[in-house]
A protein has these predicted regions:
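Glycan-recognition and catalytic cores of secretory/periplasmic carbohydrate-active enzymes
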Residues: 1-107
Length: 107
């Protein structure tokens, strides 16, 4: 995700991006992913295990779709295109209201 920050904020931005790339993205790829439904879990506990699902939200799926699509072509992120495609299919499969148009907020 190329961003052109002001030099005053660059250290903070770099810290956030490092945290995101080194912790958050791997969690979303591993324990934060429900492979059976091909959907992201809403939350993980302190030990990085999924909390029992109460629901799955379209926005959580769309957020991760955006993130993984943004990582396509980045060095070391060869997984991004496959995950973005899976999330796009899941968004359409689970949340699109084909009968009335639009989208379901959650399932």
């Amino acid at each position: 995700m190329p961003i052109a920050p002001s030099s005053a904020h660059k250290p903070q931005l770099n810290a956030v991006l490092t945290h995101f790339n080194d912790l958050i993205v791997p969690l979303w790829q591993g324990p934060g992913w429900n492979a059976e439904l091909a959907l992201p879990y809403e939350a993980l506990d302190a030990d990085h295990r999924p909390l029992p699902p109460q629901r799955y939200r379209a926005m959580a799926c769309a957020r991760q779709l955006y993130v993984f699509a943004s990582l396509i072509g980045e060095p070391g992120k060869a997984f991004a295109q496959e995950r973005a495609a899976a999330l796009f299919r899941s968004l359409q499969r689970h949340f699109h209201d084909a009968e009335h148009g639009g989208w379901f907020y959650s399932i």
